[in-house]
Amino acid sequence: MTQTPPPAPGPSGVRQAVRDIPAYPFTPIDVPYKLDQNENPYDFPPELKQKAAERMLAHPWNRYPDLHADTLRAAIAGYEGWDAAGVVITPGSNVLIKILTELGGIGQTVLTTDPTFSVYTLEAAMLGAELVLTPLNPDFSLPVEATLQALAAHAPGVFYVTQPHAPTGHSDRPEDVRRVVEVADRLGWVTVIDEAYSQYAGTDYRELVRAGKHVLSLRTFSKAWGLAGVRAGYLLTNPELAGHLQKLVSAFTINFLTQAVIETALEHPEYMRERVAEAIAERGRIYAAVQGHPTCTIFPSNTNFFLLKTPDADAAYRHLLEHGIVCRRQDKLRGLDGCLRIAVGTPAENDALIAAILALR
């Protein structure tokens, strides 16, 4: 008598790649000083919340929003000086990374540096792309020659170059960025310049995007704009490439509540610029206070966070928690032994942070 084989563990329809990938690594911790997610420490101004609320109340809630957020795309295009047909917006840039992998990475190659933003690698693994990582140089700079070799050695897929870099906070020389982007574009790679933190660095690679055929800039409202809770990210590229990407975006994906908030923010960018200026000043103040520490090293940063190298990341992390500060451990990443990633907070939060770091031994 033939025996029925035992069922496979877990739901039979789940792909092995999905089974093998861990959930996104984040556990919220309730402490007075939340410096673990590179957030803007300030909420959206109350008067702008009121303006956004008035927009929401004027809209019929029983009707679907724009199919592809055309009104909001036009507003972003006006702010960026871009063709609206070359703007794609989704609920957070993480969604854009997913559709970029769907566009050019499934069964092909995703190439970036090591370490890198974890969502690049998670989406590559989830969607069955070959992941190629080129280790950063010891000073955290882009490994230009190794990157060029990797671009030439693999069939084109998706190439990410992050400026400034996460999680190190380092900005590369514009000529190095230009060199790898132009080669990648010429070889047919979908080339993504992730500019999530560009306001804190004063960098802008839109001209590289304009000059390229397969190049795009990835941007977000979560950092400098202080709208992480709204969930909105966008990209700038040419209309042809944007049209292909738009096919992968679900219909009606941007609700009118999000549209109301983002449109209001774009009409009042001065609040964002003021907060970026404060963050840059506070970043410098923290660096000046900590750089002479006897056992810890603070690395220069062009973002709203910085890396702190400690003798023992676990002990340092627990020390900061005891002082009411939560940050993010990075010590398991290549080249970041002993490192913690800490966001720049309000002046009061930074006072507490500086005192806690100076007490570390």
From Swiss-Prot:
Q: Which UniProt keywords apply?
A: Amino-acid biosynthesis, Aminotransferase, Histidine biosynthesis, Pyridoxal phosphate, Transferase
N6-(pyridoxal phosphate)lysine-modified residues are where? K223
Q: Name one GO biological process term.
A: L-histidine biosynthetic process
Pathway annotation from the record: Amino-acid biosynthesis; L-histidine biosynthesis; L-histidine from 5-phospho-alpha-D-ribose 1-diphosphate: step 7/9
**Which reaction equation describes what this protein catalyses?**
L-histidinol phosphate + 2-oxoglutarate = 3-(imidazol-4-yl)-2-oxopropyl phosphate + L-glutamate
Per its UniProt record, what InterPro entries does this chain match? Aminotrans_II_pyridoxalP_BS, Aminotransferase_I/II_large, HisP_aminotrans, PyrdxlP-dep_Trfase, PyrdxlP-dep_Trfase_major, PyrdxlP-dep_Trfase_small
Which cofactors are named for this entry? pyridoxal 5'-phosphate
Q: Name one Pfam family in it.
A: Aminotran_1_2
What is the name listed in the Swiss-Prot or TrEMBL entry for this protein? Answer: Histidinol-phosphate aminotransferase
